[in-house]
Regions:
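Short aromatic/basic micro-patch
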Residues: 11, 53, 83, 118-120
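NAD(P)-dependent short-chain dehydrogenase/reductase
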Residues: 1-50, 56, 93
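Generic structural signal for alpha-helix termini and adjacent loop/cap motifs
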Residues: 34-38, 66-70, 128
Length: 133
C-alpha cells in the first residue's frame, strides 16, 4: 500500500508498562489497595515468569523519539530489552513504596499457558537512538 509513496508506517509495541498505579488494574494496583486496606499478605504466584517492565515515562520518551523520525518503520518495540522476574519487580515495588505487605508465594499456581519470558528486542529502537545522538 505504501510502496513508492512518501509514507512511514510505524507500529509501536509497548510491553509491561509501570506507573500510574492507582488508575489501572495491574498487580501493582492490587497490592497498593491491599496494603491500604491493612492486609499483611498478598496472594501471589511463584513470580518466576519474566517480563520487560518499562515505566510509563520511559515509554513516552521512546514513543516520542520514534514519532520524530521516519528512517525506521514497521513494528518498533518500545521496551528495555531486559527480562525481569515478576517477583523481583513486585518486591522492588513493595520496597520502593514502603508497603508493609508480604507476598504469599505459591498461593496461585502459575498458569501453564503463560510464556515463561516475554521481552522486546531493542534493535530497531537502538537504530533510532543512534540517529538521534
Amino acid at each position: 500500500i505504501t510502496a513508492g509513496k512518501d509514507v512511514c508506517v510505524q507500529w509501536v509495541r509497548g510491553y509491561y508498562i509501570l506507573g500510574d498505579d492507582l488508575h489501572n488494574q495491574s498487580i501493582f494496583t492490587k497490592i497498593l489497595k491491599a496494603a491500604q486496606e491493612g492486609k499483611e499478605t498478598f496472594p501471589f504466584t511463584s513470580g518466576k515468569n519474566k517480563y520487560d517492565f518499562i515505566s510509563v515515562q520511559e515509554l513516552a520518551d521512546q514513543i516520542a523519539l520514534v514519532a520524530m523520525q521516519n528512517k525506521v518503520d514497521g513494528i518498533i518495540n518500545c521496551c528495555t530489552g531486559r527480562p525481569v522476574s515478576l517477583a523481583e519487580q513486585v518486591e522492588k515495588f513493595i520496597s520502593d513504596n514502603n508497603l508493609n505487605i508480604k507476598l504469599e508465594y505459591g498461593a496461585f499456581k502459575d498458569r501453564p499457558y503463560d510464556s515463561p519470558m516475554v521481552w522486546g528486542s531493542r534493535d530497531k529502537f537502538n537504530r533510532i537512538l543512534d540517529e538521534y545522538k
